[in-house]
Amino acid sequence: MIEFDRVTKRYADGSPAVADVSFTVPSHKTVVLVGSSGSGKTTLLRMVNRMVDPTSGRVLIDDVDVTTMDPVRLRRSIGYVLQSGGLLPHRTVVENIAIVPRLNGATRPDARERALTMLDTVGLDRDLASRFPAQLSGGQQQRVGVARALASDPNILLMDEPFGAVDPIVRRSLQHELRELQRTLGKTILFVTHDIDEALALADEIIIVAAHGVIAQRGTPTEILTRPANAFVAEFVGVDRPERRLRLADAAGVEVVTDASGRPIGTLER
Amino acid sequence: MKWLNQNVGSLLELTVAHLALAVPAILLSLVIAVPIGWTAQRLRWARDPALALVGVLYAIPSLPLFVLVPVVLGIGIRSSANAIIVLTVYATAIMVRSAADAFSSVPLEARMSATAIGYSTWHRFWSVDLPLAIPVMLAGLRVVVVSTVSLVTVGSVIGIPSLGTLFTDGFQRGIVAEVAAGLIVTVLIALVLDGMCILAGRALTPWARAAEAR
């Protein structure tokens, strides 16, 4: 469990990046922080592994204040996926994945074996092992990033807009795969995105962040969609957008779901 | 050709002397410039003053420096140490800027990601910052190699033996072949060392070509 307890972070000039934020990420759940850029969501994420330390307030992992932990060791115990994978360009795929097990003290052959197993886990061909990141597609780089984050089997996974740099079709399949992985792995995931659809697709719980990390609403995807707390959330979620306002139509005996403008989306199963 | 046939021995001797001055200076400048460049990149406020300072060093005329260094340090004016120190000053002046640029060229994302997955600062320097700085660093090193090999010859004016001795001697005695030999071998040394830099760079940065090939 990750707990944010009245956390504030001020920049050097005194202006707040996040102000008095409290929430928890329950164990084995996926919590998605969603907000526009500059809302402080990435700052919040980075407080978990001490890339950023709060000016006041506490961040606790299983009731232990992270500021009492050694930052380097803390980071090695937490999986972290960055935008476009955050791979080291001068290391091959297998070396990139093996880094964290190596940092945690695994022998070279063990770390390598572990890395190859992780390639299988994220659905990549072992033939890619000796390539450099620049020789991979964006989607493949993302998968390697996820493999690296999972390589030491951490309890916690931090994901900072991990699928932001790939095209929408690849993004959707990566989201699907992450959901499948999470079903078997049950990690505690804190995920940051500006894409509300991504939040709806992945989250057990969504936290909508307005400016300065102020929480506009938190709830399950269904709650957010059906009962937006205020105009800001309604606007952010786009409850009035045609693709959110679905209708039923009859097409020669088949029930078709359409959006508000009548474009077909799918068929209804009862 | 007649001069060459009679002087192969001394030509070889002076070539070795030339290298014995140039190579230590080049390597020393690298060892000095890398930590300064890395610090300049980490401490933004230190960058501009540090670069300004080394820029001033480069503006000092070389001949006075060859005379001044022995006086300040109390070493022989014709000693190898004097030549190596002076050459190192100029090489470092160029190399610090290259090193600072090289560390700035390391993608922020790679540095962030290395920190995020648990590299300590020291470990990150050796495993991430330094290897990724090599391409830009190498471009600077090549300039240093060529300029240092050329600058060594100035020392011959005050009597430090190198291929430059062939210029001074040949000029005084009016032997064109001797001056030409000194010039050609100096340029050859510069080209060979430059080529070695290129080869070393290729061997050290296989990922850079992988990225280009794509």
Q: Residue spans of the language-model regions?
A:
Chain A
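Conserved ABC ATPase signature
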Residues: F132-L136, Q140-Q142
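ABC ATPase NBD coupling module
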Residues: D65-G79, L103, R108-P109
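Catalytic Walker B motif of ABC-type/P-loop ATPase nucleotide-binding domains
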Residues: L157-E161
